[in-house]
């Protein structure tokens, strides 16, 4: 089965410290943990942590902001036409399988 959320989607955080924040998915990460598939997403402006970087010959040291991954169960696709979170469904248009928003029925490009 395909991924419900992919890079480039507009999402909203539905639980956690950043609840209610919106952003665009930069990257989706999949890995195995204890025999199960676990998926995370890096979302712009969400779960931002500060990191100390040591000075090297090429770059100066300092404190930078880094976006950390967030579990896919904590985010939902955002429907901009209705302004609410929505679930993702799949349907066939001709021979092609496409994703669509269940709240509005709009096909996701």
Curated annotation (Swiss-Prot):
One of its GO terms (cellular component) is ribosome. Belongs to the universal ribosomal protein uL24 family. This is Large ribosomal subunit protein uL24. One of its GO terms (biological process) is translation. Keywords: Ribonucleoprotein, Ribosomal protein, RNA-binding, rRNA-binding. NCBIfam families: rplX_bact. PANTHER family: MITOCHONDRIAL RIBOSOMAL PROTEIN L24. InterPro entries: KOW, Rib_uL2_dom2, Ribosomal_uL24, Ribosomal_uL24_CS, Ribosomal_uL24_KOW, Translation_prot_SH3-like_sf. The keyword Membrane does not apply. Part of the 50S ribosomal subunit. One of its GO terms (molecular function) is structural constituent of ribosome.
